């Protein structure tokens, strides 16, 4: 009997717990907060990771276990190699970074065996460093990965963007959080994006198709606003994107979507999508002033 089989049959075996929270806010911002499990090549080919249950066969030798197995719910896992690919994609998109983050990416590339054909040092230079939007660092915009703030949106205005036009327009992937009969919720950098389900008609029956990933095209304006549209289909002018509160940023993607559903039901009237984004990326004082100005305009128009 192998050591992995002994561990799997033992009641004392448990998945590694999450790393303890630190008293310093910047002590672990650039490093994963979840422990990883590694396995030999011949073991992982069989899906044998030394846990109580056999996991699906995957090529990478890094997985992250988010919580312990219980009688009612088994621990979900994901590949740590996703983090490396996500960082590379966001670097290609032209996001702000510093030398320590570039060094972190190089170490991850060595560990995972991925080859980087580009010179990462050419991407970052102090002379070309653009101003960062404090709200992006504050809310941890990380493309759906909550344990790192490596990707930061570059809000620099280029000479070609003189008016309120976009200076960044890229495509990215938002991962599913929850869904119901008619709506799908995706997590994207501390935001919850609500999209309607798509229905595809075939010869036999019409069934709603729901994908675990959604291709999103986003546009960053020079005033700091962020606009999200589907890769194909109508623009999201009538759909809301809800930001996470300060206390929910760390565990936002591990929480139930019902918290956001309650917040949605508490709204008295539908709010436009752009207004929700403005309230997220603007300071609270500016938001209150804008709401006061809008209410004054409404009163004048009614009078």
Swiss-Prot record:
Residue interval of the organelle targeting sequence: 2-13
Signals that turn on the gene: More highly expressed in the fermentable carbon source glucose compared to the non-fermentable carbon sources galactose or glycerol.
Source superkingdom: Eukaryota
MF annotations from Gene Ontology: structural constituent of ribosome
Nucleotide-binding keyword on record: no
Keyword Ribosomal protein: yes
InterPro entries for this protein: Rbsml_bS1m-like (IPR016712)
Description of the deletion phenotype: Inviable.
A GO-annotated cellular component: mitochondrial small ribosomal subunit
Keywords: Acetylation, Mitochondrion, Ribonucleoprotein, Ribosomal protein, Transit peptide
BP terms from Gene Ontology: mitochondrial translational initiation
Annotated positions of the N-acetylserine modification: 2
Subcellular location per the Swiss-Prot or TrEMBL entry: Mitochondrion
Mutagenesis / variant outcome for changing residue 21 to K: Creates an N-terminal cleavage site that is partially processed
Pfam families given in the database record: Mit_ribos_Mrp51
Subunit structure: Component of the mitochondrial small ribosomal subunit (mt-SSU). Mature yeast 74S mitochondrial ribosomes consist of a small (37S) and a large (54S) subunit. The 37S small subunit contains a 15S ribosomal RNA (15S mt-rRNA) and at least 32 different proteins. The 54S large subunit contains a 21S rRNA (21S mt-rRNA) and at least 45 different proteins. This subunit is mutually exclusive with mug178/small ribosomal subunit protein L51-b.
Similarity field: Belongs to the bacterial ribosomal protein bS1 family.
Cross-referenced PANTHER family: 37S RIBOSOMAL PROTEIN MRP51, MITOCHONDRIAL, SMALL RIBOSOMAL SUBUNIT PROTEIN BS1M
Function description: Component of the mitochondrial ribosome (mitoribosome), a dedicated translation machinery responsible for the synthesis of mitochondrial genome-encoded proteins, including at least some of the essential transmembrane subunits of the mitochondrial respiratory chain. The mitoribosomes are attached to the mitochondrial inner membrane and translation products are cotranslationally integrated into the membrane. bS1m functionally interacts with the 5'-UTR of mitochondrial mRNAs. Plays an essential role in mitochondrial translation.
Protein name: Small ribosomal subunit protein bS1m
Protein species of origin: Schizosaccharomyces pombe (strain 972 / ATCC 24843) (Fission yeast)
Taxonomic placement: Eukaryota, Fungi, Dikarya, Ascomycota, Taphrinomycotina
